[in-house]
Structure formats: structure tokens, C-alpha cells
Amino acid sequence: MKEKEKIEVSFTFNTSELLYDIKNYAYIEGNIMPDDERKFQVRDIDEDGNINRLIRVLNLAYAECVEMLYPYSKDEVNTKEKDSNLELLDCYVIDAVLPIGFSQTSVNILSSLIHEYMVYRVVADWLSINKPESQGNWEIKLVDIKDKIKSTIANRRGPVKRRLQPF
């Protein structure tokens, strides 16, 4: 692809919005449970002791999304070492280089799907620990969102060109 045939797009996901949705889903899942101790465990996803797990899975979900957008998001390795320090970022940014013919609506759809994927990934992990009977529902949603992301990428690579002769 020539340089002028590409456009750079940054997908930005504010951590505060991701956390709001994650906490909201955890609250709803906990609220519909019968009154018992587990109800509060499910709803307390952002408590001090639990936030480390949330950050780790959110960072993993971000990395998975960057990988799903390959070849548009490929980054060369820029360091020879990587630590596992937990860091909650202000926002998660995915830089992608898309072909000029890539649809703006596809970019909008991808942005929404990636946001949902990151949220669902954290909620599914949290429920696998605290409410295993609901975790399967979130895993199904997660697989569905992942398929939609891949489908959006595959279907929007450019305009269809039909040859005049079939053979």
C-alpha cells in the first residue's frame, strides 16, 4: 500500500467509561442474586483488593483487541524487556493505519465493539470467580463480540471490484 493510500485512526477508550460500564454490569449481576454474601462480592469489583485483578484483565483485554486489529495495528517491538507492573491508564489507545477506502461507519462500529469487548472480558473474568453460573453467559457475549470485530475488519477491507469477464 502506498503512503497516500492510508489513513491513521486512533481508537481511544477512556478508562473512566470502561470502569463505569464494568461496575454497572457487576452491580446488576449482584443485585439480581438472592440476599447472601456473594451478592456483595460480585458488586464490589472495584474495591481496593479487587482492583488489581480488574486492571490486569483490562490490560489483557486491551492487548487482545490490538492483536485482533492486526494487520492494521501492528507495532514493531520497541523494547527487549516487558515487566508485569499493574498500571491503570487514563485511557487506552489503539492506533491503526487503515486503507483510504475503509468505511467511517466501520470505524464507528469497531470503536463500539472494542469498548464492549473490553468490558465483557473483565466482567466474564470477575464472574468466573464470584458467580460461575453467570460466567457462561458473558463468555458467549464475549465470543459474539469477538466474531463481530473480526467480521467488521474482514468485510471492510475495500470496495468490491468485479471483473468484466468471469474467466
Task: Locate each region found by the language model.
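Conserved short "hinge" loops at termini or chain/domain junctions
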Residues: 1-107, 141-143, 147-167
